[in-house]
Amino acid sequence: MMRNRSKSPRRPSPTSRAANCDVELLKSTARDREELKCMLEKYERHLAEIQGNVKVLTSERDKTFLLYEQAQEEIARLRREMMKSCKSPKSTTAHAILRRVETERDVAFTDLRRMTTERDSLRERLKIAQETAFNEKAHLEQRIEELECTVHNLDDERMEQMANMTLMKETITTVEKEMKSLARKAMDTESELGRQKAENNSLRLLYENTEKDLSDTQRHLAKKKYELQLTQEKIMCLDEKIDNFTRQNIAQREEISILGATLNDLAKEKECLQACLDKKSENIASLGESLAMKEKTISGMKNIIAEMEQASRQSTEALIMCEQDISRMRRQLDETNDELGQIARERDILAHENDNLQEQFAKVKQENQALSKKLNDTHNELSDIKQKVQDTNLEVNKLKNILKSEESENRQIMEQLRKANEDAENWENKARQTEAENNTLKLELITAEAEGNRLKEKVDALNREVEQHLNAERSYKSQIATLHKSLVKMEEELQKVQFEKVSALADLSSTRELCIKLDSSKELLNRQLVAKDQEIEMMENELDSARSEIELLRSQMTNERISMQNLEALLVANRDKEYQSQIALQEKESEIQLLKEHLCLAENKMAIQSRDVAQFRNVVTQLEADLDITKRQLGTERFERERAVQELRRQNYSSNAYNLGPMKPNTKCHSPERAHHRSPDRGLDRSLEENLCYRDF
């Protein structure tokens, strides 16, 4: 039993093992019960035999008492007769014989007393043995009944435990199925949440970009309005100047020739500026080529992303295989969590660097806008350059989005690393490759920033040239102020001013058209923002619903965990009950063994009692032999006594015959002697008959 109990937790089917143990225990208890019944039957038979022997011994004892009383009566009668008889030598011999018979009688009497004491002791022993046997029999019968009741109770409990175990197995299977379905639902919800998070991130990026564009457009509008106000003020000033210039036309006509020379110089400078613009266009073409290279790298990144998705699918397949090794990987997850914390810190540092780069880009934009204020002549070309720069910024933002998506994918990869540590090395190599690619992208961003700095330097050079031109214009204006005398020149300058006024009005119309276009684009952007807000609200509602579903699933998981804990508690209770039942069975087996030991002791006692009975029988046989010897001695004594009586009769007869005559009157006195002589004969006849009956018995 101890071996079975120690090996029971290692075996796969404890219920079948417990059932087999219960069946074996029932069989063993039934066998023990049958053996006990057989032993009780044998013990009852033995007691019946002992009781029969006791009855026979009591009947023999009663008969011996009767014979002893008869012998005492005869001895007393013979003593009386001998005392009445006269004294003679034959009477002395008879007295000697009587004394010897009395001594033998005393010896026989002492033997009878000893036999009575032994018989009383045997009776007491038999009574004690009978009482102990009856008590043991009653105790054994009660014990057998208790064992039968316990066996029935154990059968009922075993059936109940089997039913409970079947119910528990069914509930466990159902709970496992529900857990699997819930795990699948949780995986689906997690995948959907990941997708929704990615979409939300993309929408947030788009929203941020649109907000930035709106802020830029609002700034442009404010700047344009300010420029319009400045142009209007300039127009007012120009009107005033025209009034002044009409007065000074005569003085300025003389200096028109000098201004024509200066205009030729300005044309040459304009050609130089066009050459610079050609160089800038070439630089823009080189930037386009670099953008094409970046697009190629982006396509390569997309291919890498596709490979990563395939690897993620393979990892999901590997996850199914790695669910069995989750318990082994929990220890390694802490180390990977630390590494992930370090990687997250590095990513935060990179994010701060990206923010700094964005701030630098914003500063570059502000500087470009300041340059756009100063460079009204090269505004269109610079606007094209700005559009290209914005395209590059969009591409940079796209690259940032790609980097963020790659970071999210890296997070997913790290989560997969938590679940499957065996593929960690491969994923780390891939992560290193992606980091190298990120480094290459960073280098490309640095090159783009360097190109932006070059463009800034070129713009600064252009600003310097513009300042030089402005200084020249100022010098020209000073010269024009000195040339107030030439009215003809002033009229030409008036025509030029009118031409500039027309161009300014054209610029105003173009700016107004641009403002209208910007307003329309603003409205479109507002509509897009409203639509995106609606989409974001829908996504938030979906997220709320998903969160509510997740909370419901969590509550279901908690309820299922509670039910599993209850089931485990029930299993533990059932195991405790089984253990207690096994302990009770062991105790009952120990009690059965104790009963067996008691039976062995009772058997030993019975054997000892049987030996004592055999000894008593031997003693009884010896006593019977002693009785036979005493009876023979009594027979010999009776025979001698009869001979003595016959001799006494002969002597009395001879004396009677010799004294017949004188003794006739005394016949009356002899009659009692005859009666006395006849009475012992009759007593002897009776004693002989009793001896014959005793021998026949």
Swiss-Prot record:
Keyword match tRNA-binding: no
Record's comment on post-translational modification: Processed into N-terminal 27-kDa and C-terminal 55-kDa fragments.
Sites bearing Phosphoserine, chain numbering: 687
Segments of skewed composition (Basic and acidic residues): 670-684
Disordered, as annotated region: 656-684
Keywords of the record: Cytoplasm, Cytoskeleton, Phosphoprotein
InterPro entries xrefs: Centriole_BasalBody_StrucProt
Gene Ontology MF terms in the entry: structural molecule activity
Keyword Phosphoprotein in record: yes
Region (Interaction with HIF1A): 556-688
Predominant location category: cytoplasm
GO biological process: cell projection assembly
GO cellular component: centriole; cytoplasm; motile cilium; neuron projection; sperm fibrous sheath; sperm principal piece
Intrachain disulfide bonds: none
Location relative to the cell: Cytoplasm; Cytoplasm, Cytoskeleton, Microtubule organizing center, Centrosome, Centriole
Tissue: Predominantly expressed in testis, in spermatozoa (at protein level). Not detected in Leydig cells. The N-terminal 27-kDa fragment is also detected in liver, while the C-terminal 55-kDa fragment is also found retina, brain and kidney (at protein level).
Binding partners and assembly: Interacts with HIF1A.
Role of this protein: Plays a role in spermatogenesis. When overexpressed, prevents nuclear localization of HIF1A.
Family recorded in the similarity comment: Belongs to the CEP135/TSGA10 family.
PANTHER family membership: CENTROSOMAL PROTEIN CEP135, TESTIS SPECIFIC 10
Protein name from the UniProt record: Testis-specific gene 10 protein
